[in-house]
């Protein structure tokens, strides 16, 4: 089983992935591919340099390049109980993964209102997160420009994540339970 987790920043993708990891899934993150390529190229890694690097990578090799590279990793990691892919950033990526990994592929969209995501971002205080509403809106604009929201229409499951962390964990466990029942 391969579960692709998508959503806007602070929608709960990483927390959802943690639940899957606790249930034996191997979690792979799209951003890790970009970070490794940047490291190999000797490029310093921060949010802005990652955006610039990934944008130039997509222009040079196609919008689905990160997905194609991820597909190779997934094929190498097939021994796991399941695989969770976190952080799809556009329609070409989800379509490429569906095509390349046709068996047992499930796309999950984390649905969370912008005001809730902004509050979460302020609370988590990651080094590369914007620290004000203006910065948050700029980041939203960049994500939308990449087509992150377009991934939603390809979701097999939409999980509303506007409650507590415990609520999200319950939703994740319920989904895993349903998948195990249908397997």
Q: What are the functions of these language-model segments?
A:
Residues 26-99, 134-138:
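ATP-dependent small-molecule kinase phosphotransfer cores
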Residues 14:
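Walker A/P-loop
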Residues 1-3:
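Extreme N-terminal starter segment of soluble prokaryotic enzymes
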Residues 86-87, 100-125:
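Conserved phosphate-donor/acceptor-positioning beta-strand/loop module used by diverse small-molecule
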Residues 11:
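ATP-binding Walker
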Residues 8, 20:
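P-loop (Walker A) phosphate-binding loop of NTP-binding proteins
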Residues 64-65, 123-178:
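Small-molecule kinase domains that catalyze NTP-dependent phosphoryl transfer to phosphate-bearing small molecules
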């Amino acid at each position: 089983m391969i579960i692709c987790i998508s959503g806007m920043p602070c929608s709960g993708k990483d927390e959802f992935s943690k639940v899957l990891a606790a249930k034996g899934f191997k979690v792979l993150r799209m951003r890790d591919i970009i970070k490794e390529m940047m490291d190999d190229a000797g490029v310093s890694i921060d949010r802005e340099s990652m955006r610039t690097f990934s944008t130039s990578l997509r222009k040079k090799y196609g919008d689905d390049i990160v997905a194609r590279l991820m597909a190779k990793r997934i094929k190498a990691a097939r021994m796991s109980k399941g695989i969770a892919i976190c952080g799809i950033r556009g329609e070409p990526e989800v379509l490429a993964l569906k095509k390349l990994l046709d068996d047992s592929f499930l796309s999950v969209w984390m649905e969370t209102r912008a005001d809730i995501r902004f509050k979460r971002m302020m609370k988590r205080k990651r080094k590369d997160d914007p620290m004000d509403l203006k910065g948050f809106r700029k980041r939203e604009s960049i994500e939308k420009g990449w087509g992150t929201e377009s991934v939603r229409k390809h979701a097999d499951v939409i999980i509303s994540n506007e409650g507590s962390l415990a609520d999200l964990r319950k939703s994740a466990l319920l989904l895993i339970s349903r998948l195990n029942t249908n397997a």
